[in-house]
Amino acid sequence: MASEFLYESGIGEERAIFVSGGRILSARIGWGDPLRPGLVSEAQLIKRHGGTRRGLVRLDLAEGAAREALIDQLPREATEGVRLTVRVTRAAILERGRHKLPVARPAPGETLRPAPTLRAEIEATGARLRALPTTANDFSRHGWDELVEQAQTGEI
């Protein structure tokens, strides 16, 4: 059996597993958060950390929503309140007792665009991908349910 990604898209969730020899070698889940790597958006610098090239921006998302992200590699002349185009380079990370904000970098001249979907990210690598209907049981057959249980309990 050839190595490939199996992909499902459901309501509010995308998931993909990389299978080879009937076994899951890796898994990815996307929950549709717009603030993830690849997003290019307008933002306002709301705080600049003194003496550094870092700060905090508020990104303008669809339908008037706004979210904050850390920003690094700010130009020296960027002052609080300035509007700039940024590209998200790291998604938010939830750790026990701590929420790390997404990270962005200035992206002058880039076209505004949403972050790529999980499917688009995989397809961009050139990897073989087979999209499945959500009614298929291929994920379960390859051990998806056990993998999710291991991730939730921390027991392998």
Model-derived segments and spans:
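Single-stranded RNA-binding surfaces
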Residues: 1-156
